[in-house]
Amino acid sequence: MPKDQNLDIARKQDHIEINLTKNVESTLKSGFESIQFIHNALPEINYDIIDTSTTFLGKYLQAPILISSMTGGTARARDINYRLAQVAQKAGIAMGLGSMRVLLTKPDTITTFAIRHIAPDIPLLANIGAVQLNYGVTPKECQYLVDVVKADALILHLNVLQELTQPEGNRNWENLLPRIQELVNYLSVPVVVKEVGYGLSKKVAESLIKVGVEVLDIAGSGGTSWSQVEAYRATNSLQNRIASSFISWGIPTLDSLKMVREVSGNIAIIASGGLKSGIDGAKAIRMGASIFGLAGQLLKAADISENLVSEEIQLIIEQLKITMICTGSRTLKDLAKAEIRL
């Protein structure tokens, strides 16, 4: 196996292990802790008619939840993705795949990403780093990634800080926006642009919307700090110190959501980054998100069993439903107008 392929696989293995065994939380908070719903002691609603359903990428969701992109490319990642997909199908929620760049150089890793046979009905998102468009990945190859997993959209993740704190990371982020526009015009499915834990600003959101991006995943600060993950991967003290110095970097998720909401118009917004519960998810919906994404606690559960993933998703959905009835919200549209105290 060529050296760069070995490095890709080793990096993916490192990322799973570090996320499961180390504290890689940002020191920033997501911001949702500052929002309090006004409790409705007399909601006049039957719990049995609470409707958490919505549509995303033209498909029906039983709840406004995305299992955010995590992993792929290794045997352990395959098991994790299979468990996540099984639960996503049963729960009627969306799922993103981990970065699929390795698939372009190591085609036999397809089994670690191919979950459509397990989850035939869900919105499924393929995924590659946006900066790879500056390093030879073509629109045709991106379409291949979509086709090979039968995805409904392609995530381009923006991970500039992570790349810059990786010894082997990509450094050239120049003229990337025109390449994103070229890809948007080429692909047969929508492009989702996603941060990885540092948030999207109003200015960046405007730029992406202008070139035709249809979905933004703000992925703000408050959850996993990928610079901290890279600090654990560092091979010398200087690399560790550089990466560790950015543990409080980024735009908190709530702030990013507010910024992006100002310019989003009718495009879909995914709120992720430090959301821990269905209550946080409800707050995200209230503040303008279309759906919300979670990863960290689901990764830990999926590394063990499908049952633990299922229990975690059931917990999140039940928290969402109880929040809805306690705010007098029969539907997600009602929830988006619920009374809050900031």
Curated annotation (Swiss-Prot):
Its main location: cytoplasm. It is an enzyme of class 5 (isomerase). It comes from Rickettsia akari (strain Hartford). Homooctamer. Dimer of tetramers. Transmembrane segments: none annotated. Belongs to the IPP isomerase type 2 family. This is Isopentenyl-diphosphate delta-isomerase. Mg(2+) binds at E163. The gene is fni. Its cofactor is FMN; NADPH; Mg(2+). FMN binds at S68, S69, M70, T71, S99, N127, K194, T224, G274, L275, K276, A295, G296. Keywords: Cytoplasm, Flavoprotein, FMN, Isomerase, Isoprene biosynthesis, Magnesium, Metal-binding, NADP. GO terms for biological process: isoprenoid biosynthetic process.
